[in-house]
Amino acid sequence: MLTLVAVFGCTAVAAADLVVIVNPGSGVRSMTRDEVAKVFMARYRQLPSGTTALPMDLGPDSLERKDFYMRLLGKQLPDINAYWARLLFSGRASPPHQVANSAAAVDAVAENKGAIAYIDKRQVDTRVRVVLELDD
């Protein structure tokens, strides 16, 4: 039994601390969970500063992606994928752009004024601004 606790304890420690980042030139200093959710679900097309939003998703097999949607919306990836399938079919919206990993997300956000992404907190650097921390 102690072994199981140790294994599960390690898994919990290994889960990434996620943060939402934007370009420092976006004019955004912080965002609420609700604002971030609306940007990533295409309900808001702009960041709070009025800059056109360019949300970035990590790859479909990314653990950070799974954790992000669970922490932010309480939804599993199949639910998120079904949501986007409906919106794509109706022509109402397109899903966020995909990048390979947190490092690529940082690069994309640093290069695009309206970009917004979620990453492993350990990947944050001076080229981006953290606007929300997502705790377990």
Language model regions located:
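Bacterial N-terminal signal peptides
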Residues: 1-9
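Sec/Tat signal peptide C-region and signal peptidase I cleavage site
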Residues: 10-16
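Exported/periplasmic ABC-transporter solute-binding proteins
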Residues: 16-136
